[in-house]
């Protein structure tokens, strides 16, 4: 007999029959719930409060639950109703922002009653097996065996043996969730895009990215591209992941083309023509099938050469580097995560993070998924968080330990260079690593060459075997880390 309020665009029984999962229908019917729906997202947009649904939903809650307190009164002087108290709090909270903002919130409170729809639950829902189908889980053992049960609120059923004894968890698991929570997602207008990559730069969730496709590459029919600026021999595309997008609209807001279109329209008082914009926020259903497939294809594209995408050259080029922080659980439009994302684009393949407890520990390390991921070589950030609010000391200790390990490793590599006096290539490789060990890019090249030499020698049976194996065991320290 309880009441269930659902914020969705499906405000008819017919729509709910199609969109609700069978299990949810079964539970609602068996519990004899009073089902109410309201499209708070649409209402908020109409009122100029895009994405701000809490006031509408709170008003709807009190409208449904009048046994808690009177919802409204015919007496305008009655201050003890839900509507009067909510409006009082709206004025108290927003009056410093101006009368227009206060009135928007008043309108949001008043809109709930007139837009609330009660759905009579049919008896057939108690046993039905019809409804929205379950999404197929990603083909990843850890996600299927550990993450999915936790997301389904069945984590208590997992044995302790399902987890690593040291508490570490695999990275790069948010990409398997594909939550599809956005109501509106950006649609790329290929004709208007100026290829500035600002949309990617500001995206808090790394769900919209630029891609370069080498000329002559066979691409799917729907994967439209245009000649790339400043990248001869390549075509350009902006691709969104509709099922990972949070629908915040920051990309569309920052787009210079969109801003110009808005300014031009303002001069005449006309509405902005969608055709004049490079990014338009459109319903998820319009794009999801086509763009989800395009996103999956984009992940198979080869990385563009570094001379084309020199990530330290400028902001635009930095966005062609793979973000190693993606699809976090941060709030839609988060202002922190774009910085974290860009850091991983610049330094992520050698990053070690001593995290400070706060939002960054929630969107960065919430169980059961991890937004930090790896590149195609398997390199990415290592992340840890201390709950003692001592991340400076925590990170300092990591750095001291790392330096001690590297200094010891340097001595071992120097000793190996002496032992390899008759192995010219190996000796030169050891010396090259020692010379470049404190240079970020130089140590990458030298480390890769040294590992090849170590792998060719570690089981050859010579007197260097033990030393080679010791160095190889600590190959994670060969590339200079960024703390």
Task: Please report, for each region that a protein language model flagged, where it lies by residue.
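Ferredoxin-type iron-sulfur electron-transfer modules and their immediate structural context
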Residues: 86, 90, 95-245, 252-482
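Active-site cofactor/cluster-binding pocket
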Residues: 1-148, 218-222
């Amino acid at each position: 007999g309880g009441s269930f309020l659902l914020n969705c665009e499906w405000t008819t029984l017919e729509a709910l029959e199609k969109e609700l999962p069978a299990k949810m229908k079964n539970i609602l019917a068996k519990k004899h719930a009073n089902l109410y729906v309201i499209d708070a997202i649409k209402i908020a947009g109409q009122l100029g409060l895009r994405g701000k649904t809490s006031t509408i939903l709170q008003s709807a809650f009190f409208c449904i639950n009048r046994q808690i307190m009177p919802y409204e009164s015919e007496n305008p002087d009655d201050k003890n109703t839900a509507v009067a108290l909510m409006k009082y709090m709206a004025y108290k909270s927003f009056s410093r922002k101006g009368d227009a903002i206060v009135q928007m919130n008043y309108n949001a409170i008043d809109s709930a009653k007139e837009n609330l729809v009660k759905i009579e639950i049919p008896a057939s829902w108690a046993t039905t097996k019809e409804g929205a189908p379950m999404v197929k889980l990603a083909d990843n053992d850890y996600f299927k065996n550990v993450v999915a049960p936790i997301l389904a609120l069945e984590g208590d059923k997992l044995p302790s043996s399902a987890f690593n004894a040291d508490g570490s968890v695999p990275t790069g698991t948010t990409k398997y969730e594909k939550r599809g929570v956005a109501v509106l997602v950006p649609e790329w207008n290929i004709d208007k895009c100026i290829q500035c990559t600002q949309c990617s730069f500001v995206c808090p969730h790394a769900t919209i990215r630029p891609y370069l496709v080498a000329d002559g590459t066979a691409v799917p029919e729907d994967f439209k591209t245009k000649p790339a600026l400043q990248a001869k021999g390549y075509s350009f595309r902006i691709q969104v992941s509709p099922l990972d997008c949070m629908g915040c609209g920051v990309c569309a807001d920052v787009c210079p083309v969109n801003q110009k279109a808005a300014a031009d329209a303002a001069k005449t008082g006309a509405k902005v023509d969608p055709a004049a914009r490079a990014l338009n926020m459109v319903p998820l259903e319009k794009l999801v099938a086509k763009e989800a497939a395009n996103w999956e294809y984009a992940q198979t594209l080869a990385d563009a050469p570094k001379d084309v995408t020199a990530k330290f050259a400028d902001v635009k080029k930095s966005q062609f580097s793979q973000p190693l922080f993606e699809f976090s659980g941060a709030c839609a439009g988060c202002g922190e995560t774009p910085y974290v994302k860009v850091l991983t684009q610049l330094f992520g393949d050698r990053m070690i993070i001593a995290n400070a407890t706060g939002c960054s520990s929630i969107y960065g390390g919430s169980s059961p998924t991890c937004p930090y991921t790896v590149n195609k070589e398997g390199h990415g950030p290592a992340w840890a968080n201390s709950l003692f609010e001592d991340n400076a000391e925590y990170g300092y200790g990591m750095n001291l330990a790392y330096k001690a390990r590297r200094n010891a490793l340097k001595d071992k590599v120097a000793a190996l260079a002496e032992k390899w006096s008759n192995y010219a290539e190996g000796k030169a490789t050891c010396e090259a690593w020692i010379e470049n060990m404190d240079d970020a890019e130089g140590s990458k090249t030298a480390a890769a060459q040294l590992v090849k030499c170590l792998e060719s020698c570690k089981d050859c049976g010579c007197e260097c075997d033990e030393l080679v194996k010791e160095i190889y065991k600590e190959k994670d320290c060969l590339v200079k880390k960024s703390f």
